[in-house]
Amino acid sequence: MDIFGIPIQAFLGQLLLGLVNGSFYAMLSLGLAVIFGLLGIVNFAHGALYMIGAYVAWIGLDRFGMNYWVALIAAPLVVGALGVAIERSLLRHLYRIDPIYGLLLTFGLALIAEGIFRYYFGVSGESYPVPELLQRATNLGFMVLPNYRAWVVFASLVVCLGTWFLIERTRLGAYLRAG
C-alpha cells in the first residue's frame, strides 16, 4: 500500500522522524514564546542559549564524568541562571524604550556567544554517550525507533504540558499572565 506514491512503511517512518524533529522545535519555540509573552523581548540569543545548554551538558558528561540525567537537569538550570543574569543586568534597562534595542542586544549577545564557542570548540558538533536506558530500540513493525528518539518526544510532551499547566492552572501562572 502506498500513500502519495510512497510505501506506507517509509511514509510512517518519515512521519515519526518529523514528530521527533518537531519535538525539538516545540521546546525551542516554547521558550521563545514564554520570553516574548512575559518580557515583550524578541530574544535573538535564544538559540545561542540553547547551544550553551548543550555544551554545559556535554562538558558535564565529557570533562567531569557527570551522569547523563544529572547533566540533563544541570544544563537548563545553568542556562536559566545565565538568562536571569542577562535580564537583570542588560535587558531590564530596555523595557521602556523602543523594542528594537532589545532585539539588537540579544542579536549581539548571540553573535558573541557563538563566536566564543566557535573559537574554543570549533564548528563541528560533539558526541556524547547515550545512557544505557536509551541505547535500545523498539521495533514498531514499519521501522526500528531508537529509544533516545522516543525520549525526545516524551520529554517534549512533559515540558510543553508542564509549562501549559504552570501558566494556565496555577497561581504563579495567573500572576504571570496578569503581567
Model-derived features: where do they sit?
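Small-residue-rich transmembrane alpha-helical segments that form helix-helix packing/gating elements
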Residues: 1-39, 45-179
